[in-house]
């Protein structure tokens, strides 16, 4: 609602919610890893053959959203709003409802990711997902999603995720520290955004 009704920039709204949630978590846990994880969440550490449970969930969600975005009216409306919200509004689409639906879906995916990550590490800690926000932005941008919206696709994002994961694995294998990893990922995002801007100018 902050974004659709109050016209707050999405990035600003995301940062606001990030600070609010982190503050509430800090107050609840007092900065100390605490709580317990139900034994049922231990399933995320299991695997079926060479596929781990989180990887299977990732494949399943990719398949579901690929069908949703490419083969349903809702998906076409999402792309229409993303490409040109004003044109979509003039064509009779409820831009506000579509945006709200997309943010709800994104929140559900964040919850699923949080549950899986919590089950994986086995405790609650405010620093548990530090750096994953940068990874998600990097994967989307590297995969071809325009930083300011209006362009992108699921297949490109999947490719971006694989590229960032390969990059992270290489950094670990090279024995580089966490600070260097952040620097490299930041440079990757900068390069991707710069290349996109250059391509737009040439077009």
Give each language-model segment a name:
Residues 5-7, 71, 97, 148-151, ...:
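Helix-loop interface residues and adjacent transmembrane-helix termini in multi-pass membrane transporters
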Residues 74-99:
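Short cytoplasmic-facing helical segments at TM-TM junctions of multi-pass membrane proteins
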Residues 110, 121-186:
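Transmembrane alpha-helical segments in multi-pass inner-membrane proteins
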Residues 94-118, 130, 134:
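Transmembrane alpha-helices
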Residues 63, 90, 94-97, 167-203:
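Cytosolic-side transmembrane-helix boundaries in multi-pass membrane proteins
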Residues 6-74, 98-101, 120-129, 180:
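Transmembrane helix-bundle core of multi-pass membrane transporters
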Residues 18-25, 57-68, 103-114, 140-145, ...:
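Hydrophobic core segments of alpha-helical transmembrane domains in multi-pass membrane transport
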Residues 1-7, 156:
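Transmembrane-helix boundary motif in ABC transporter permease subunits
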